[in-house]
Amino acid sequence: MRVSDLFIYPLKSARGIALPAADIDAYGLPGDRRAMITDAQGHFITQRELPDLARIEVRPEATAFRLLMQGKTDISVTPPQPENRMDVTVWKSAVSAAVADPESNRQLSEWLGREVRLVFFDGQARRTANAEWAGEATPVTFTDGYQILVTTTGSLKALNADLAAHGEGSVGMERFRPNIVIDTDEAWPEDRWAAIEIAGIRFDLVKPCSRCIMTTQDQLTGSREGPNPMPAMGRIRMSADRRVPGPLFGWNATPRGNGKVTIGDTVNIIEERPEGWALKRRAAA
């Protein structure tokens, strides 16, 4: 097995960036979900609420980054001042975040048709993952919960096979917004992986990822009119464990070391979860 793709998402819920290689540190992939859009009160906003976020492209620059959206004037975001801060929430986590300059926030609010703030996870920000799954003091940025999302090509192929068998269109891996994609022949092997090793770095697969309405959205347009993977996940990937309810695709992973991962790197299984993950069994139609 080998690494087939690597992605970061500099702005939470905006378009991803494909990478040929990526450094790995305690937070995951540097630059991943270090910026986020919130409402005026600091509550995080994603494609679940605002599908148009899928239309925002992020181009990293020497100082900060540029935001682009078709039909809109580019926004050049300057580095935030550490003293300009606000308290924001990501799910149940409270974070002190640096706030973008007023002009960037004004332009972004015009783009999205509502008052928003662009905030940054800077050197003063602190947040940790759920200790029940990831262990104590595991740092995270503005991700939904963990540092890295791992998916496999074999699992996507199996999901698309189920969609095709029911006369439904196929979807791409971008619907699931992974960080590390592993090329596999087998479907769902990740359910049995407790830990893998890539380029000398251990990754603990700590929790399966339950999926939401974002998987139904085209990741270029934000449209929900195209192929929808949710019915297939409902048929073949419904969790039977009440701790993680809903349809599953991919696993949240926590790195246990630093290093660099490159496309083509070999993936070794170093610890298995023989029981896999319990799924609901649906009666044949």
Description of each model-found segment:
Residues M1-A285:
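Metal-cofactor-dependent catalytic cores
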